[in-house]
Amino acid sequence: MYHNDYIDAVTEYLRRYREFSQYIANVKTDIDECQRMLELEASPAASSMSPTGGCGGGEKVSQEERMYMQREDLQRKIRKYRADLQQIEPLIRRLDSSMASLKDINETDARILESRYIDDASWESTARYACCSVGSCRRRARTALKTLTGMMFGPDAVPMQTSVVFFKR
């Protein structure tokens, strides 16, 4: 059996495509929420006159310090979210563009990969969706995965057999 780590990685990316896409959307939403919270203008509380004496209830951290720490925490979250996005978003963009290119080259192969790996459909359902037999669907899935892997990681990811020529002397 032929084994290639790049093909296994592409298969895993396809299987988790919806999960990764939703994660990217959620992280972008979290970044927007943190930025909106940073844009809010913080105003310190006004001193109040209380009939009871004291210095404010023994609170050790002032409200201004709490707001400053909250801003620092929000900025730290934004940096973490952006680092997470920098890891996964280029990969998903590359997968999207490679799938679009595969669809332009061979729509049947793109349908097979989408149905079988992204939608997690059975081979029978995939064959109906791609309008081909189950056996043909399985064979084409292997070649389509190799093609998609080559598109994503370059020609070195899927080694091709070159011609072997023997010369007589």
Task: Label every model-predicted segment.
Residues 119-136:
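Helix-turn-helix DNA-binding module
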Residues 1-102, 153-169:
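N-terminal interaction/assembly modules
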Residues 14, 28, 106, 124-127:
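Generic alpha-helical hydrophobic packing signal
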